[in-house]
Amino acid sequence: MFRIVTDTSANLPTAYLQQEHITIIPFTFHADGDEQACLDLNTFDANTFYAQMRSGTKVSTSQIPPQRYLDVLNPMLEAGEDVLFVSMSSGISGSYASGQIAARQLREEFPARKLLLVDTYSASLGEGLLVMRAVDCRREGMSIDDTYTLLRSLRHRMAQIFTVDDLRYLRRTGRLSN
């Protein structure tokens, strides 16, 4: 048995996360300098977020810092649990790299424990589907190593397509460069 941890980008319902004992590490965003955590789909008000962007409020997102990973993962490893972290794509966020920094430190502190990070190459439901597959693997009794290997294989079999109404919002939040 192993713990599954992901970030809020997975967009999974809170009831599912609780039922399957999945821990979430939240992303944060800033609206006019005010930091707000995106904890889950129940507490994050997407309508307000997008209305703020449309009204000209300066909104920016930020990656999960290494310390937040340490705060969440350390107690799990300390309790003798192995952890599989399923992350948003490293291509659109630095959070996976932050997770790697924290993981290096934690592996030194807990050499007997396994801490494996999966870069999903996805976001939103693509990431969420891999989290759900990890839950299925755990339920079926697969090892953390076999689950990790499977997820790394499956991430190459997905493609995500999205559209936006206006590119300026991607530019404002740092998701689109000049």
Predicted regions and their residues:
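Mixed-charge interfacial surface used for oligomerization/domain docking
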Residues: R3, S9-L17, I22-Q36, G91, ...
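Class I S-adenosyl-L-methionine
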Residues: Q36-E109
